[in-house]
């Protein structure tokens, strides 16, 4: 092997290690979510706690493009807190959650816009259904 090929070999090796680390990190987060989401669905864990921990795990995982995912989980933390505090009903929360689940594998800011719009709509509907105080 020539000395010219050595840097290329090292770069390839490091890239392979980085890809493995990223893949392992993503799989670890996905496994955690699959294990804990049923706890939130059954009421054994608050939705806000689930999404806050999910957000923390994603933020601490070395992933190349995690920006839209972090934003989407932030939207879900907000939506779940509104739901738990009665500012959004179950149908509204499920609407936001459904959009997030549908687009969870797409790193697209447009998916986040849909989730934010669903949350705003749920808040508006909730406010309209409550009598003035």
Language-model-derived ranges and their functions:
Residues 18-133:
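Acidic, Ser/Pro/Thr-rich low-complexity regulatory regions
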